[in-house]
Amino acid sequence: MIEVITDDKHRVAEWAKPKLEGNIQWANFQAFGFERHGDLVGAVVFTEYTGNDIHVSVVTTDPCWWHRRYIKLLYEYVFDQCGCIRISALVNESNRKSIKLLRGLGFKEEGRLRSYFNPKDGIVFGQLRSECKWLER
């Protein structure tokens, strides 16, 4: 059984930080954790909220928690609670699993930051609310 942790963002962030790449801005963030048998197995970290956009990073050590109901929950948080019109992600070009996941969720490749992950490029992905297949219209 998976338990969603929404009220302990600092513990979730401490678990996720060593597993994340890039220059994440931790000043204002939200983090949801996913526990199995009392151990964190996944986290979704939201940073760089601008009102219209929010950056998302996903960390997992066990994909058992990645189900439709949790995906829908995350999109509802971004688009309904935060009121964003888009969601963004930045991924190392060598992270094929994350790229496949983002494309499967409906994200579109929007650009490339050359040598962002020294020496690898960063690929910028985005998704508009109007493109989101996970929310009811």
Placement of each model-derived feature along the sequence:
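Conserved N-terminal entry element of GNAT/NAT acetyltransferase domains
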Residues: M1-D8, E131-R137
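Acetyl-CoA-dependent GNAT
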Residues: T6-D53, P63-C64
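A short, internal acetyl-CoA/4′-phosphopantetheine-binding micro-motif in the GNAT/acyltransferase core
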Residues: S57-W66, N92
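Conserved acetyl-CoA pyrophosphate-binding loop and the N-cap/start of the following alpha-helix
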Residues: W66-L74
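Conserved GNAT acetyl-CoA-binding A-motif
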Residues: D80-V91
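Conserved catalytic-core motifs of GNAT/GCN5-like acyltransferases
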Residues: L90, K108-I123
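Conserved active-site alpha-helix within GNAT-family acetyltransferase domains
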Residues: S94-G111
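C-terminal "cap" of GNAT-fold acetyltransferases
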Residues: Y116-R137
